[in-house]
């Protein structure tokens, strides 16, 4: 069966995008509370696949790549900036793989990339705004390279940061 895009699906039906991977991974013991960086894609890809599949079996029409907080600023804070691109690409590839794995005759799930708040947004600092824009561009670029169907932006505390994310998407 061919896969319709998000907008085409929304013309005639609801699209469910189940979310909450971070808290589910924490609940299952794969993440420590506090850092909340999606290293699971590198450290235990099978566990991440299983979480995606559980969301899929619960009715999600979208497999959202687990890249929440997987941006340059957060990775720098925990001293793992060198894992930035490998982590993002691994999470995107896992999501894409799971999205294709559907019951015969069913439409494949959509794949969503993900960007989130950066914790460095400063409405009065143009340099910080440029830095945030660069981080969004990086993550969106990797998501596009890996073939996502759309990008989700989430958990922004400043409207201006959310608008910047939307502008980059």
Language-model regions, residue ranges each:
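Domain-level signal for soluble alpha/beta catalytic cores
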Residues: 1-169
């Amino acid at each position: 069966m061919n896969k319709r895009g998000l907008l085409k699906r929304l013309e005639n039906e609801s699209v469910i995008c189940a979310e909450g991977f971070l808290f589910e991974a924490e609940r299952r013991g794969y993440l420590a509370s506090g850092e909340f960086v999606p290293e699971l894609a590198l450290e235990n890809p099978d566990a991440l696949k299983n979480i995606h599949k559980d969301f899929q079996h619960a009715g999600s029409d979208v497999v959202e790549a687990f890249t929440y907080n997987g941006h340059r600023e957060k990775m720098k804070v925990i001293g793992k900036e060198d894992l930035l691109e490998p982590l993002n690409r691994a999470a995107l590839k896992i999501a894409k793989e799971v999205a294709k794995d559907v019951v015969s005759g069913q439409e494949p799930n959509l794949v969503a990339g993900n960007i989130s708040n950066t914790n460095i947004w400063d409405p009065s600092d143009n340099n910080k705004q440029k830095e945030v824009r660069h981080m969004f561009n990086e993550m969106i670029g990797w998501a596009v390279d890996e073939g996502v169907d759309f990008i989700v932006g989430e958990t922004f505390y400043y409207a201006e940061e959310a608008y910047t994310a939307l502008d980059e998407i």
